[in-house]
Amino acid sequence: MFCSLSTNAQNNYPKAATPEMEFVMQLNVTLGEAYTVGETQSGKRHVIPITGGTFEGPLLHGTIINGGADYQLVSADGKRTTLEAIYSIRTHDGVYIHVRNQGIVYSGKDASGNDSFYFKAAPKFEAPADSKYSWLNNAIYVCAPSFGAPGTITLDVWRVK
């Protein structure tokens, strides 16, 4: 019965449009020496200090503030890591923006049974409501990494339109 209701619902409602993406910025993050807290009730906890860096996009650019960290929790089988990076950025004109970036790293089999590596995250920005960057507060963002020199990570950030 549920399947027939679901099928009928699909036939009676318009399909949502596939979201588009708009490039927002590239963050070039410098990292400190990682350390391990150890096994916790939730999994193995690692912490990677965020020591600085820069960011640049069509509508903003500036620096990444030293003092944040990427808090990682590794599953018991070691295949899945949840990430929560918390840090602040400062625009070229002195506006501070808080960032909380949550994501997943997975290395294992995909739905087809093939070996897979997945690493994506969803940053949330908290810009001052009275600033010209307040538009960052009102959208969903996704990011994907690339790796370069040791001790660095680059994140490309897009706004879901």
Predicted feature residues:
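Bacterial Sec-dependent N-terminal signal peptides
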Residues: 1-12
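Beta-strand-enriched cores of mature, soluble protein domains
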Residues: 10-161
